[in-house]
UniProtKB/Swiss-Prot annotation:
One Gene Ontology CC term in the entry: extracellular region
Organism: Pseudomonas aeruginosa (strain UCBPP-PA14)
Signal peptide from the UniProt entry: none
Phenotype reported upon loss of the gene: Deletion mutant in PA14 strain displays an approximately 40-fold decrease in competitive index against PAO1 strain.
Keyword Secreted: yes
Record bears the keyword rRNA processing: no
Transmembrane parts of this sequence: none
Protein name as catalogued: (p)ppApp synthetase toxin Tas1
Reactions catalysed, as given in the entry: AMP + ATP = adenosine 3'-diphosphate,5'-phosphate + AMP + H(+); ADP + ATP = adenosine 3'-diphosphate,5'-diphosphate + AMP; 2 ATP = adenosine 3'-diphosphate,5'-triphosphate + AMP
One Pfam family recorded for the sequence: PAAR_motif
Cross-referenced CDD domains: PAAR_RHS
């Protein structure tokens, strides 16, 4: 039965391995499934053996025996004295024993030559037991063990029972931590399962010996299917998943308001000097900032550059002038050339270190680029209706298409025909918008 129990335990472990449970829930389900699988296979093997009267394998032959006491003309066997020549260990219930194996158990009330009388089912030190003997002589009394027994089968059975009880206790604890409703639910489900097992046992007893074990064992294996379902319930998402907070994030994010005030003051001064305006974006949200840090900067919050950001909007012929002044102030300026950009977009991105200790981002765009890349509602807010309508009249194409082209293009292979077709349309679109003196 050891091999069957191990197989059942492995089945239980495999069932849980296919789930996504983690932490305490996974430990409870894994322990419970291993115990259920092993104990169920114990019962299945025992039930089938009893029902079909399957013969047990012979693993050894008893030798010696009492020199002066006989049972049906055969030497009576004594615990602590007589042996089996060897033990083959089959069917993996106990280890191979290539030397004499002592009888370890006998009757506590019947002695032969001062030794407990061995009888059917008395165990050997290897864990095997005596399976044949006299059919008409019975030796009574409780069992006395006179030597250590390497009883792997009994140890495994006891261990699986203990594991099952531990899983039950852990499950009740987790349910209690989850709330009264969860605890009541677990107790109710457990009660139904135990009641069902009892009914199956009663039905099996009516059919004959062995059926109780068979029915309960098969039901136990079937119940293993509840393991993955419980894991999925325990791991069911409760709203949107929380983004992991990068180490040092709070310190960096706390500097964003001061950085924003500083770059907004710089942008206001340059816009006033060159007849433009400033689009002041709010500080990037905490959730979006953490996502970007985790995805783009491997969790390093010191590398994010646009917690504080704004855009200076000036006429196209002044974009490069403003960019040069930002560079003179120490900003790292990147000029995006429409002829080199794959989608034809043009503009200026700059990163400026602030006294707050984190960088801020200042973009420089012409009204035409704002018209092209922003939605109409946003572009009208940034430019004002008069400027928006004037750009629209010069461009002769609808606004806001640049961002749409970008979103369609970025999910494709840049070398694919579809991506190249979108890029060509985007370049033509930006060229059309730039007719109105956009950068």
């Amino acid at each position: 039965m050891v091999a069957g129990a191990v197989a059942g335990a492995l089945i239980g472990a495999a069932v849980v391995a296919a789930t996504a449970a983690t932490g305490g829930l996974a430990a409870v389900i894994l322990a419970g499934s291993i115990a259920a699988g092993g104990l169920s296979m114990f019962q299945i093997v025992k039930g089938l053996t009893t029902i079909f009267e399957l013969p047990e394998p012979t693993t050894g032959v008893l030798i010696r025996g009492s020199f002066n006491v006989y049972v049906n003309s055969r030497n009576a066997m004594r615990a602590g004295d007589d042996v089996s020549a060897t033990c083959s260990g089959l069917p993996l219930n106990h280890p191979l024993w290539p030397f004499p194996v002592l009888i370890a158990e006998g009757s506590a009330t019947v002695y032969i030559n001062g030794k407990p009388a061995a009888r059917l089912q008395s165990k050997m030190v290897c864990g095997a037991h005596i399976k044949t003997g006299s059919q008409n002589t019975f030796i009574g009394g409780p069992t006395e063990r006179v030597a250590f027994v390497l009883d792997l089968e009994e140890w495994l059975h006891t261990g699986l029972e203990a594991l099952g009880l531990a899983a039950l206790a852990g499950g009740l604890l987790l349910a209690a931590m989850a709330g009264v409703a969860a605890l009541v639910g677990v107790v109710a489900i457990g009660g139904l399962m135990m009641g069902g097992m009892a009914l199956l046992g009663d039905l099996g007893d009516r059919l004959g010996p062995g059926y109780r074990d068979l029915f309960q064992g098969v039901a136990g294996m079937a119940l293993l299917g509840f393991g993955p379902k419980m894991a999925r319930l325990g791991n069911a998402p409760k709203g949107a998943p929380k983004t992991q907070v990068p180490k040092g994030f709070e310190k960096v994010y706390g500097k964003a308001p001061a950085a924003k005030a500083e770059i907004d003051a710089v942008a206001d001064g340059l816009a006033a000097k060159h007849g433009g305006r400033v689009a002041k974006a709010p500080i990037k949200s905490r959730e979006r900032a953490m996502q970007k840090i985790n995805n783009d900067y491997k969790g390093d919050p010191t590398k994010i550059k646009d917690l504080a950001r704004n855009t200076i909007i000036v006429e196209g012929d002044k974009v490069n002038t403003v960019a040069a002044e930002l560079a003179n102030r120490g900003a790292k300026v990147k000029v995006i050339d429409g002829n080199a950009d794959p989608l034809g977009y043009s503009g200026v991105n700059s990163t400026m270190n602030t006294k707050a200790g984190i960088p801020g981002e200042i973009q420089v765009n012409s009204p035409e680029m704002i018209y092209a890349k922003e939605s109409e509602d946003m572009a009208r807010i940034l430019l004002g209706n008069d400027t928006y309508d004037a750009v629209a009249a010069k461009a002769g194409v609808p606004g806001g298409q640049g961002h749409k082209y970008y979103e369609d293009w970025r999910v494709l292979d840049p070398k694919s025909p579809e991506a190249q077709a979108i890029a060509e349309k985007s370049r033509a679109y930006y060229d059309a918008v730039r007719k109105g003196n956009g950068n």
